[in-house]
Amino acid sequence: MSSLETLWPESMVRWRCRRGLKELDIYFLGYFDRQYAKMSVQERGALQFLLLQQDPLLQSWLVYEQIPDDLPSPAKILLRSMIADQRQHQDAPTQE
């Protein structure tokens, strides 16, 4: 993760959260909308790292929760946070 020299502008991060797979859009756009403003620089770097990965890997990590041991620690922590956030959001009662 040290290869990330600068963080992307917020608008670019949000654009990159649009993945093309509905399942990934739900995870990334939902997490971005709910959490990005509160994220630390390290967490934003981890998100940027994840956004550079291929969709099949991201799907495996997020949807099927197959997070590899050799992934950088900040990325693993963020993936777990994204999974927990999505579960919490799914379980929240809808307001009509």
Positions of predicted regions on the chain:
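Positively charged, polar, low-complexity stretches
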Residues: 2-45, 49-96
